[in-house]
Amino acid sequence: MNHKRIALNYFYFSMWTGLSGAALATMIRLEMAYPGSPFFKGDSIKYLQVATAHGLIMVFFVVVPIFFGGFANFLIPYHVGSKDVAFPRLNSIGFWIQPLGFLLVAKIAFLRTTSWKYYDKTSFFLQPYNKSLYRDFFNFLTGELSFNPFKKSLDESLFLFLWKPRKKITNTEYTSFFFNPLNLSFLDSFFYYSDNLWSLANKVVSSRRKKIYVTKCSNRAAVTAGWTFITPFSSNMKYSGFGAQDVLSVAVVLAGISTTISLLTLITRRTLVAPGLRNRRVLIPFITISLLLTLRLLAIVTPILGAAVLMSLMDRHWQTSFFDFAYGGDPILFQHLFWFFGHPEVYILIIPSFGVANIVLPFYTMRRMSSKHHMIWAVYVMAYMGFVVWGHHMYLVGLDHRSRNIYSTITIMICLPATIKLVNWTLTLANAAIHVDLVFLFFCSYVFFFLTGGFTGMWLSHVGLNISVHDTFYVVAHFHLMLAGAAMMGAFTGLYYYYNTFFDVQYSKIFGFLHLVYYSAGIWTTFFPMFFLGFSGLPRRIHDFPAFFLGWHGLASCGHFLTLAGVCFFFFGIFDSTSENKSSILANFGIPKIAKRAHLYFFKISYNNYTNEIASELPKVEVRKFIIENTFGEYECVKLVPVTK
């Protein structure tokens, strides 16, 4: 239940989920590397399954656990002067719910897409028990709709409870979901011929049988709604049968429950802070300010998503009509609810990286952040303006021109606080004694990704351009540069900056540099060509494309493998640093290497005249043991006497 242990669990969990998401992305890029569906062999349902699972895993189970599970759990208690989170046991429960949701989403990518039977709102697998019945069933599939495939079994009602042993059918695609360890004929018939008792009851009471729908690629495994759960595809059994869509809905609800439980243990920091820090934001590190702000945003928008998904499930199974237009519902309402969650979620994923940048930049420029008050207010304005611009995701659903103009104007206005941040970063870098290190290079890469993603997003705020490129690869390139580029670069920057604090070892500079070069080059090579594909009008969510676009898609697939190489170097670096057990020193635990007189105000504690000589003379300590054995209040007792010359 220790908050540091739970934070490390979140980090390790995000690493494994990131690998699974990268594997799904590899399947997508192999499919799109060449025209003609070379990987999925024309199976469009499988492509939708993989793309949906990839999107949900990367958003809900990679980026969110890194920032709000890893960084927040580890750093916030120390930065506010608390020994632990408010509810440690609840915090542990919140983490262990995450793998359940992840496993449900990951299963979607591996569902079978052929030979399914859809039986109104009750689905089961159909397994004929002999070749003649299989031939009759094939005739039923090919057009004899009046034929009942269970007629022969009903005629043999003498064997209703004593079936003959089932024979294996060769040259078919049928498989078994049930396992009968004792090979009992009654259990065998009960599982594989579950319609017999129902058919017999129908025969007795002369009631009308339910309709049977059988297709080669039935909708039980279909996820036509995508990762956005768009209605009516997600709320109507006609488009997504009983199966995959319900699993996705339950997984998202579990992820929302886990996130809500975790943020409740951290958002109560006002009752845990040290005296004098309750209303003094300037005395709290910027990363903690950004994390606490985004936790508030999560507390607002996560219940909205959960309510929308639950209403969709009720439409599917309990015959309600929240999103059914035929019975007075509104399918557009779900999109409003989802994007009221979805657009603040974008800022929830990117704002913590602002905090990381504002922690890293003063450390490597040897000067204070330029205008910290303006940086704080810029982040607050950006976060709360994100609640009123969700409509720019919905220009194509039939919004009137007045609503479009309002959403477009406010979206453009969000560029102002983002510009304030970039200007302050530039002023901090101006005339600074910059110490170029691996973490600083990650910060520079993060800024370039954020600039490109922000500019392309600003262009999407224009209604005319958005309508033209909304369903093209332009949008794919934009949000991947923001998430896989800016958000993940911010996470890597913070991870390398706090590497000694988190893992008690020094990172490998060689593998870290290779990780930076290959990952950055791979992301640019993968997604920058997609801007040209989008301007050419190539639609997204389609698993095939004309040969005319082979060049750009081939380049994007090559870039993806560069990104995979960078991810491999990241794990090689972790293995190298932990296997060699490179000891960390207290100087890397948060004391800046300053070569000139400086004043570092850290919770009303003033440290003056710290030099490189003092930092190098600090004894080597076990940082993990130091953190666990000392609470934050005892840090004030640790005094380092400056060298007097």
Swiss-Prot record:
GO MF entries: cytochrome-c oxidase activity; heme binding; metal ion binding
Pathway involvement of the protein, from the record: Energy metabolism; oxidative phosphorylation
Chain sites annotated for binding O2: 347
Subcellular location as annotated: Mitochondrion inner membrane
A Pfam family assignment: COX1
Residues that, per the record, bind Fe(II)-heme a: 54, 480
Binding-site positions, heme a3: 478
One cellular component term from this protein's GO annotations in UniProt: mitochondrial inner membrane
Membrane topology: Multi-pass membrane protein
Reactions mediated catalytically: 4 Fe(II)-[cytochrome c] + O2 + 8 H(+)(in) = 4 Fe(III)-[cytochrome c] + 2 H2O + 4 H(+)(out)
Residues the entry annotates as binding Ca(2+): 31, 36
SUPFAM superfamilies xref list: Cytochrome c oxidase subunit I-like
Alphabetical list of InterPro entries matching this protein: Cyt_c_oxase-like_su1_dom, Cyt_c_oxase-like_su1_sf, Cyt_C_Oxase_1, Cyt_c_Oxase_su1_BS
Signal sequence coordinates: none
Subunit structure: Component of the cytochrome c oxidase (complex IV, CIV), a multisubunit enzyme composed of a catalytic core of 3 subunits and several supernumerary subunits. The complex exists as a monomer or a dimer and forms supercomplexes (SCs) in the inner mitochondrial membrane with ubiquinol-cytochrome c oxidoreductase (cytochrome b-c1 complex, complex III, CIII).
Function: Component of the cytochrome c oxidase, the last enzyme in the mitochondrial electron transport chain which drives oxidative phosphorylation. The respiratory chain contains 3 multisubunit complexes succinate dehydrogenase (complex II, CII), ubiquinol-cytochrome c oxidoreductase (cytochrome b-c1 complex, complex III, CIII) and cytochrome c oxidase (complex IV, CIV), that cooperate to transfer electrons derived from NADH and succinate to molecular oxygen, creating an electrochemical gradient over the inner membrane that drives transmembrane transport and the ATP synthase.
Name this protein carries in UniProt: Cytochrome c oxidase subunit 1
Species in which this protein is naturally found: Paramecium tetraurelia
This protein's encoding gene: COI
